Amino acid sequence: MKMRYAITYGKMKEFKNSDETKKEYAKYKEAAEKAGLKLLLWGSPFGVAESSVVVIDFGGDMDKFVKFFSAQSGPWTDSRTDFVLEY
């Protein structure tokens, strides 16, 4: 088994409207794809303090994920990440 997915929670930045929100997440998805990652899902989580969640498939390459996440800011602040094993 190896780590494969990252679930990142954060406080969504202030955007003017839903179109701007979609645009920012689309830019983040494009940047992830250029780094060899896949942004699978994004949305609003339930039952946690954060207002944003993304699920990223990094294909088991933790170094690739850490490099991307360290260099690229997302449309959120105050993030935390859980990693999920591929079974």
Give the predicted meaning of each segment.
Residues 70-78:
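A common structural junction motif
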